[in-house]
């Protein structure tokens, strides 16, 4: 009996030490925790009708160039609101070089896209729908398509008081809808555990939380309710092999160099994705990308800005090795010295930041039978 009591005491002490270690790590940075209410801009208040309209538009192929790339084509609910590939499919005739990010919880970011090129969902929507390697839609043409559909004319009149649909209003509606694509804290093991349900998170995940906030140091960049500091770092990640090997990707990537205002030399030697540099034009920012949220990552692989890491096990192994070897890597990354069990524990905790089941929205019924000629 004395031996059993000793074991129980040791386990209790270990649990206390684990919690204390995690709390100490959290104290240095904004703590992890449930997401606050979704921020809503004063000039785009949310209503049920606006959200419903935005959902239809998010799914509607008519808001793209040739009718083949609606928003949902790269952000499928069943694929974690990404497209499931290492790099985004891109518009027909082009090939992208970055991973299609999940839009879950995108309402909480202060900068969107991997390189932080826009600061609101209202600005993000046209960048995607009209971007040459994404939707490639012409604004005036898409606007006229909406005006051919009586149901949309009536819906825009109801929501915005407009006689005719305008794309600025369409993008506002899409942004309102995206603000509903968020995690539910009651279905997230870590959030439930923090709220007092100590059975919500496994012992493995609890050990992983201590590592996350302590030895592994993940909390230094993945902090706050979003599990992201929303800053930009160069992780030394290798380029996706297709960047050097795929002619169509090279053509598209070099065209983008001109679009982003790089130098002639930068165009001629476009052998890497320069990331945040495209926004700042500061050479120190070459290869930097925004810290992604860790919420819902259980469902959003492949990972990193170019999808080169297929699983969370690979992600942890990458950081355990001290990151990659590409030029300009942040000095924040050092080898972690995690054991095999510690790596498993860390993955278990990161998965506990996702809901127990993926967030799924059913396809909406789209109005009208008019389609662009290219799709007929």
UniProtKB/Swiss-Prot annotation:
Write out the annotated subcellular location.
Periplasm
| Catalytic activities | 2 Fe(II)-[cytochrome c] + H2O2 + 2 H(+) = 2 Fe(III)-[cytochrome c] + 2 H2O
EC primary class:
oxidoreductase
Chief localization: periplasm
Give the cofactor binding note. Binds 2 heme c groups.
Q: Which residues form a coiled coil?
A: none
One Pfam entry name? CCP_MauG
Quick one: which residues bind heme c 2?
Answer: 218, 221-222
Which superkingdom is the protein from? Answer: Bacteria
Positions with a binding annotation for heme c 1: 71, 74-75
| Known cofactor(s) | heme c
Gene3D superfamilies reported for this sequence: Cytochrome c-like domain (1.10.760.10)
Q: Which InterPro entries does the record associate with it?
A: Cyt_c-like_dom, Cyt_c-like_dom_sf, Cytochrome_c_Peroxidase/MauG, Di-haem_cyt_c_peroxidsae, MauG/Cytc_peroxidase
Residues annotated as signal peptide: 1-24
Task: Please list the residue ranges annotated as the Cytochrome c domain.
Answer: 49-157, 203-354
> Does Chloroplast appear among the keywords?
no
The cellular component terms of Gene Ontology attached to this UniProt record, alphabetical and capped at eight, are: periplasmic space
Print the keywords alphabetically. Heme, Iron, Metal-binding, Oxidoreductase, Periplasm, Repeat, Signal
EC number(s) given by UniProt = 1.11.1.5
* GO molecular function terms noted in the UniProt entry: cytochrome-c peroxidase activity; electron transfer activity; heme binding; metal ion binding
UniProt function note = Involved in iodate respiration. May play a critical role in detoxification of inadvertent H(2)O(2) generated by the iodate reductase IdrA/IdrB.
Please give the subunit comment from the record: The iodate reductase (Idr) complex is composed of a molybdopterin-dependent iodate reductase (IdrA and IdrB subunits) and two associated peroxidases (IdrP1 and IdrP2).
Report what the protein is called: Cytochrome-c peroxidase IdrP1
């Amino acid at each position: 009996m004395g031996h059993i009591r000793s074991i129980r005491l040791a386990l209790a002490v270990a649990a206390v030490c684990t919690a204390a270690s995690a709390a100490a790590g959290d104290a240095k940075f904004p703590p992890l925790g449930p997401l606050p209410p979704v921020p809503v801009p004063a000039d785009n208040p949310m209503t049920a009708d606006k959200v419903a309209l935005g959902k239809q538009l998010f799914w509607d192929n008519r808001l793209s160039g040739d009718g083949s790339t609606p928003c949902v084509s790269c952000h499928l609910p069943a694929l974690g609101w990404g497209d499931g590939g290492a790099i985004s499919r891109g518009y027909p005739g082009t090939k992208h070089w970055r991973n299609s990010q999940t839009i879950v919880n995108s309402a909480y970011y202060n900068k969107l896209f991997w390189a932080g090129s826009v600061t609101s969902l209202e600005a993000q929507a046209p960048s995607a729908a009209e971007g040459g390697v994404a939707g490639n839609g012409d604004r005036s043409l898409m606007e006229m398509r909406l005006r051919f559909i009586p149901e949309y004319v009536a819906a825009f009149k109801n929501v915005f008081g407009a006689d005719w649909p305008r794309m600025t209003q369409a993008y506002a509606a899409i942004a309102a809808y995206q603000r509903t694509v968020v995690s539910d804290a009651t279905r997230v093991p870590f959030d439930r555990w923090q709220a007092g349900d100590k059975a919500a998170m496994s012992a493995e995940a609890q050990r992983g939380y201590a590592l996350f906030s302590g030895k592994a140091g993940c909390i230094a960049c993945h902090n706050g309710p979003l599990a992201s500091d929303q800053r930009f770092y160069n992780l030394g990640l290798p380029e996706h092999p297709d960047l050097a090997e795929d002619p169509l990707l090279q053509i598209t990537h070099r065209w983008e160099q001109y679009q982003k205002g790089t130098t002639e030399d930068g165009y001629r030697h476009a052998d890497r994705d320069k990331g945040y540099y495209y926004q700042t034009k500061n050479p120190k920012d070459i290869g930097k990308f925004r810290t992604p949220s860790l919420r819902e990552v259980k469902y959003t692989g492949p990972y990193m800005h170019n999808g080169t890491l297929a699983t969370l096990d690979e992600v942890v192994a990458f950081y355990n090795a001290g990151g990659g070897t590409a030029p300009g890597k942040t000095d924040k990354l050092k080898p972690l010295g995690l054991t095999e069990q510690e790596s498993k524990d860390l993955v278990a905790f990161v998965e506990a930041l996702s809901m127990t089941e993926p967030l799924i929205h059913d396809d909406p019924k789209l109005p009208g039978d008019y389609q662009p000629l290219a799709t007929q």
